[in-house]
């Protein structure tokens, strides 16, 4: 089974998370996507909502999307959510599956600052989402890694990637539709009493309004 993994604070989860994940799922013919809320994100300040509230929002979204599941493996931890630890744990639980960890190009460019980043490739492939026409500068330090591990996939009529012989360790660049949406933007709108109907799934907006979340 080919499993995509998208982690994040999801404070709140919005179309800027969901639409790229759907595009990646189709582009790489993934069997499912795990949406994985962080508990204590190492690179971010503490979230505005509780872990339970963010889990509820993500679970609601997954119930509306075919092939999407909530993964609470990081939310159950009392320690920071280091990706390499999570992937190692997921791989030990599902050694027969191919894991595809999804990230944006901005995160990929900062990869060397991640905890034990080299070991990520022992457990999963990386999927690097990029904007149409975007190219990494040839002199950038990450270009060598991208080139060495990049898997130029050729899609069949079913959209399945050919020639994937390795169970982990490759990089799959995927061009996605740009989404100019941020959780900060949504929280600010909600605090002003605005209703961002175009940025959130209806099930998420209903939960936020019913629970009166993100109010000043």
UniProtKB/Swiss-Prot annotation:
Function: Catalyzes the reversible adenylation of nicotinate mononucleotide (NaMN) to nicotinic acid adenine dinucleotide (NaAD).
NCBIfam families linked to this entry: cyt_tran_rel (TIGR00125), nicotinate (nicotinamide) nucleotide adenylyltransferase (TIGR00482), PRK00071.1-1 (NF000839), PRK00071.1-3 (NF000840)
E.C. no: 2.7.7.18
GO biological process, one term: NAD biosynthetic process
GO molecular function, one term: ATP binding
Reaction(s) catalysed (UniProt annotation): nicotinate beta-D-ribonucleotide + ATP + H(+) = deamido-NAD(+) + diphosphate
Protein name: Probable nicotinate-nucleotide adenylyltransferase
The entry's keywords: ATP-binding, NAD, Nucleotide-binding, Nucleotidyltransferase, Pyridine nucleotide biosynthesis, Transferase
Family classification: Belongs to the NadD family.
SUPFAM superfamilies: Nucleotidylyl transferase (SSF52374)
Pathway(s) where this gene product acts: Cofactor biosynthesis; NAD(+) biosynthesis; deamido-NAD(+) from nicotinate D-ribonucleotide: step 1/1
Keyword ATP-binding annotated: yes
InterPro entries in alphabetical order: Cyt_trans-like, NadD/NMNAT, Rossmann-like_a/b/a_fold
HAMAP family for this protein: NaMN_adenylyltr (MF_00244)
CDD domains: NMNAT
């Amino acid at each position: 089974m080919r499993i995509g993994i998208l982690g994040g604070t999801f404070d709140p989860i919005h179309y800027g998370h969901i639409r790229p994940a759907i595009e990646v799922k189709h582009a790489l013919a993934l069997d499912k996507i795990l949406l994985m809320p962080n508990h204590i994100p190492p690179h971010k300040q503490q979230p505005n909502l509780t872990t339970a509230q963010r889990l509820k929002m993500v679970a609601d979204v997954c119930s509306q999307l075919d092939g999407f599941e909530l993964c609470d493996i990081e939310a159950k931890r009392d320690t920071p959510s280091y990706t390499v630890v999570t992937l190692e744990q997921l791989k030990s639980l599902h050694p027969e599956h191919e894991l595809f960890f999804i990230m944006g190009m901005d995160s990929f460019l900062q990869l060397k600052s991640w905890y034990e980043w080299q070991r990520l490739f022992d457990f999963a492939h990386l999927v690097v989402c990029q904007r149409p026409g975007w190219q990494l500068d040839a002199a950038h330090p990450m270009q060598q890694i991208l080139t060495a591990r990049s898997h130029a996939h050729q899609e069949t009529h079913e959209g399945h990637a050919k020639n994937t012989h390795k169970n982990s360790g490759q990089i799959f660049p995927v061009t996605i539709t740009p989404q100019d949406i941020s959780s900060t933007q949504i929280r600010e709108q909600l605090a002003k009493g605005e209703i961002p109907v175009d940025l959130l799934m209806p099930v998420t907006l209903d939960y936020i309004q019913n629970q009166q979340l993100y109010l000043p």
